[in-house]
């Protein structure tokens, strides 16, 4: 028979050391994108957020959608850079999707930019919006990684 010996090690921490530490956060600018009056149902408006190197689209659907803001909960905004390879996508008003010409990924704009087809491995980056009392639409954050960036999520 073989005998084995083992040792157990323990680390003792003070309560201060054991407290959860906040992770680093990305601070986003609160950019005004448009006014509700500027939007037409199912007509995309080109925007950029959080900076000029991040193209996006602002959409009004006329009925409440996932992540929608405004009086009807029908206004959303997304990055138009495909999360697969960064191709610039176009909006299809027929099926309310953003479509990539590169490898044919498709994303449902009524369901939070959820991927419905193609090679992408994540949903679209959705811009977090707020509507003020004057109807101005402000972007204040991003909920997914924008293609080509290493850290832009909250």
Question: Which stretches of residues belong to each language-model region?
Answer:
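N-terminal export signals
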Residues: 1-21
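N-terminal pre-ligand scaffold of iron-sulfur
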Residues: 14-95, 125-154
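Short, solvent-exposed loop/turn motifs
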Residues: 53-55, 106, 115
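A short, acidic/glycine-rich surface segment
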Residues: 65-68, 111-115
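Short loop/turn microsegments at loop-to-beta-strand junctions
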Residues: 73, 103-104
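Iron-sulfur (Fe-S) cluster-binding segments and ferredoxin-like electron-carrier domains
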Residues: 89-94, 106-113
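Short cysteine/histidine-rich metal-coordination sites, predominantly Zn2+-binding motifs
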Residues: 96-103, 114-124
